[in-house]
Amino acid sequence: MNFFKNILFFPISQIFRFFTSLRNFLYDSGILKPKIYKSKIISVGNLIMGGSGKTPTVEYISRYYIKKKIFFSIVSRGYKRKSRGFIIASEKDNPKSIGDEPTQYLNKFSNYSKVMVSENRNYALEYCDNNDINYVIMDDAFQNHSFNKDVDILISSYNRPFFNDHIFPMGMLREPRKNAKRADILIYSNCPYDMGTEERRNFVTKSQKYSDKKAPILFTK
């Protein structure tokens, strides 16, 4: 069954690979250039379609900023929201208007941050620059090359590590494994409490076939 499935999906995955590789090439070659903003931008994203544990990382960074008394912004696409366009979230918003994760961020961090949603993240970044919001956490932006990033964090689930996955629709990858090399930090989420040293070493070895060997690799529960 898998053999015939692979035969069917392989050509589609190659078309998907072509377009993602073309987009990356246009930015890597300088034909397209990212916009440069004053704000310090931390991007938290993944290589796969679907969840991989980004939200706890966004919340961890948020709590760090709060501890340091830094006002910041969290910018999300607002996945599954019923609205469109650029929205600065307020107490009247809910999952329908801004999405599940932004609502969660709003409920937890609204006293210390601006939560924004936009299909075009540059609208939010322009707002931050114009309103002296100097620190931005960009949720799910690993594939977005349209703006500069100071730190690019890649999240991969322990249960579905990117180094074992394949390009959609043969697998769940949005782009080739080799693009993990863009990550400044690689974090494995949902790791078991009893994950041993040898298993961690194995994950590191397999990850570094694709990631930057200088990038720290972390393991979280």
Question: What spans do the regions from the language model cover?
Answer:
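A transmembrane-helix-recognition feature enriched in membrane-embedded lipid enzymes
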Residues: 1-40
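Walker A (P-loop) phosphate-binding motif
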Residues: 24-91, 193
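Residues at the starts of beta-strands that form the adenosine-phosphate
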Residues: 70-72, 151, 184-185, 216
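Phosphate/Mg2+-binding loops and adjacent switch elements
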Residues: 79-109, 113-211
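Beta-strand-loop-alpha "switch" segments that mediate conformational coupling across diverse proteins
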Residues: 217-221
